[in-house]
């Protein structure tokens, strides 16, 4: 299980690296999907299934709309690939910063905390991640509806901006 968690963590870092050093939005969406799937799988393996599902829906529902909008506006005939020197430089600098953070965190003794899952707290009849579901739908229903209407409005705004002068996504910016 430890090796599986380390593998998921490595894939999550690589997905974040793909999003941070994306040469064009075409490749950034691949990194976003990888990072969100692996991050939600990481939470799922810790036992937080509801939060994992909500984050998966939010990331793939909300952030992919932003990437579709940016892809439609970035009409690059020759997009840069991940093998270009500028993109490789971004990736190497990102890995150097992560390694420096790991060294500083190791020297400060931040690795002694361990991992606590939602089932390891004691004898509860309801798991900790499901105890907030009732509060989410009862007390948070107003903000839930406001967020839904905001996302719907954002969708219409993005569609109107992309439409432009009835040229669709083909127009050059």
UniProtKB/Swiss-Prot annotation:
State the annotated membrane topology for this chain. Multi-pass membrane protein
Q: Does the keyword Mitochondrion apply?
A: yes
GO MF terms here are:
NADH dehydrogenase (ubiquinone) activity
- Documented EC number(s): 7.1.1.2
Name one matching Pfam family: Oxidored_q3
Listed A to Z, the keywords are: Electron transport, Membrane, Mitochondrion, NAD, Respiratory chain, Translocase, Transmembrane, Transmembrane helix, Transport, Ubiquinone
Do the record's keywords include Translocase?
yes
Reactions that this protein is recorded to catalyse: a ubiquinone + NADH + 5 H(+)(in) = a ubiquinol + NAD(+) + 4 H(+)(out)
Primary location recorded for the protein, binned into one broad class? mitochondrion
One GO CC term of this entry? Answer: mitochondrial membrane
Q: Which residues are listed as membrane-spanning? A: 1-21, 27-47, 48-68, 87-107, 139-159
Annotated localization: Mitochondrion membrane
Q: Which domain of life is it from?
A: Eukaryota
* Similarity comment: Belongs to the complex I subunit 6 family.
Q: What does this protein do?
A: Core subunit of the mitochondrial membrane respiratory chain NADH dehydrogenase (Complex I) that is believed to belong to the minimal assembly required for catalysis. Complex I functions in the transfer of electrons from NADH to the respiratory chain. The immediate electron acceptor for the enzyme is believed to be ubiquinone.
The protein depicted here goes by the name NADH-ubiquinone oxidoreductase chain 6
Q: What is the lineage of its organism?
A: Eukaryota, Metazoa, Chordata, Craniata, Vertebrata
Q: Gene encoding it?
A: MT-ND6
């Amino acid at each position: 299980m430890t090796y599986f968690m380390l593998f998921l963590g490595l894939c999550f870092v690589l997905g974040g690296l793909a999003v941070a050093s994306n040469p064009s939005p075409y490749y950034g969406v691949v990194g976003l999907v990888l990072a969100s799937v692996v991050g939600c799988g990481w939470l799922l393996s810790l036992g937080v299934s509801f939060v994992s599902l909500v984050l998966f829906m939010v990331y793939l529902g909300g952030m992919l709309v932003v990437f579709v909008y940016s892809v439609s506006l970035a009409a690059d005939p020759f997009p840069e690939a991940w093998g270009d020197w500028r993109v490789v430089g971004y990736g190497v600098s990102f890995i150097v910063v992560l390694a420096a953070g790991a060294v500083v965190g190791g020297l400060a003794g931040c690795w002694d905390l361990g991992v606590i899952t939602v089932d390891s707290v004691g004898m509860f009849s309801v798991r900790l991640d499901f105890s907030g579901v009732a509060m989410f739908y009862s007390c948070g229903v107003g903000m839930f509806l406001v967020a839904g209407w905001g996302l719907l409005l954002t969708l219409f705004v993005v569609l109107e901006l992309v439409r432009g002068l009835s040229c669709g996504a083909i127009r050059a910016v």
